[in-house]
A protein has these predicted regions:
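Short, hydrophobic transmembrane alpha-helix segments
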Residues: 40-50
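Membrane-water interface of transmembrane alpha-helices
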Residues: 64-86
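Alpha-helical membrane-embedded segments
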Residues: 136-152
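Select subsegments of transmembrane alpha-helices in polytopic membrane proteins
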Residues: 20-31, 98-111
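Short membrane-interface loop/juxtamembrane segments of multi-pass integral membrane proteins
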Residues: 83-103
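Alpha-helical transmembrane segments
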Residues: 49-69
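Alpha-helical transmembrane segments and their membrane-interface junctions
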Residues: 34-42, 105-137
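Cytosolic-side membrane-entry/anchor segment at the start of a transmembrane helix
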Residues: 1-34, 150-174
Length: 174
């Protein structure tokens, strides 16, 4: 289905522009930002280190799982559709309608910027041998990449496959 006409979209949460994936991505980004905002002023305290480390590792784990799931789903779709990695994880080309691409790209950009700024703030004022727990935030953008992949695997619009789809049984073993 081409994404040129948004008038066909309804308020149903299963439609591409109202997908729950978008809500999960925005919520995960919000959780990370709140954890970072709490952890920055208390970066030397153990509770803040566990908070930012735990949230970052949880979002990273979710991102890894969703990235792998999206890749497996995209492999299935690639038998009949021209699916590219950039289309899948960065929503390039006609993969997603502009509102979806805007939200998911902004969420990923916010994750990247917040992670880098948090890691940089964590370095400031560290004594030798101290832990920069805020640096765990650099793991979080994997969550955004995974959410992009899930959305694109479920709802993405791809062109028809240009070449003949190759089945694993079409190859002979030498």
């Amino acid at each position: 289905m081409p994404w040129h006409d948004d008038s066909s979209m309804t308020d149903d949460p299963t439609t591409p522009t109202r997908s729950r994936v978008i809500g999960v991505d925005v919520a995960g980004t919000g959780v990370f930002l709140v954890a970072l905002i709490i952890a920055v002023p208390f970066r030397s305290e153990r509770f803040a280190q566990f908070l930012i480390g735990g949230v970052s590792m949880l979002l990273f784990a979710i991102g890894m799982a969703t990235t792998l799931w999206a890749y497996a789903r995209a492999l299935e779709r690639s038998r009949t559709e021209e699916v590219g990695v950039a289309n899948l994880y960065l929503l390039t080309g006609p993969t997603a309608p502009k509102p979806v691409r805007r939200i998911l790209t902004w969420a990923l950009a916010i994750q990247v910027v917040a992670a880098v700024v948090g890691a940089w703030i964590g370095v400031v004022g560290l004594d030798k041998g101290e832990l920069n727990a805020l640096a765990f935030g650099v793991l979080v953008p994997m969550f955004g990449i995974g959410m992009n992949g899930v959305w694109a695997a479920l709802h993405g619009s791809y062109g028809p496959r240009v070449g003949r789809a190759v089945s694993p049984t079409d190859h002979e073993m030498d």
